[in-house]
Amino acid sequence: MLLIGLTGGIGAGKSSVSAALADRGAVVIDADAIVKELQSPGTEVFAEMVERFGVGIVADDGTLDRAAVADVVITDPQALADLGAIVHPRVHAEIERRIAEQSETANVVLLDIPLLAEAGWPGLLGTIVVDLD
């Protein structure tokens, strides 16, 4: 199995690359989608976030108010670190679970992880390609 890491900022073209490779048979594991799943109401992550940051991060419909979370963590380095401690280990574990699930059947698995280098993933990958303008 070829394991490819894809990273880049907003508007960098990650979605286009992911879609093109998926059209050619690659299995795409999207970290942002996993984060949203893990932060759904009723999950441990959601409960821990509400416990840490308060009910002000819950929207009227009971879902996570991402803008409210951003308002809290943007100016508070400790809050940002706490958010990372709640979310990142679970995302990492879920990505590893999905990789293992695909290891016997997939030829190519693409990890779409916006914070690939910052999250400590490069050691998992056999090849890293960087394109600088």
What residue ranges belong to the model's regions?
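ATP-dependent NMP and nucleoside kinases share a basic, alpha-helical "lid"
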Residues: 96-104, 108-133
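Short, flexible turn/loop "capping" segments at secondary-structure junctions
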Residues: 26, 61-62, 120
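Walker A (P-loop) phosphate-binding motif
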Residues: 1-26, 30-33
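Generic leucine side-chain signal with a strong bias for well-ordered alpha-helical environments
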Residues: 3-6, 64, 111, 115-116
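ATP-dependent small-molecule kinase phosphotransfer cores
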Residues: 33-107
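Short alpha-helix boundary/capping motifs
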Residues: 11-12, 39, 132
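Short, structured coil segments at secondary-structure junctions
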Residues: 24, 53, 123-125
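Residue-level recognition of specific faces of alpha-helices
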Residues: 9, 17, 37, 72, ...
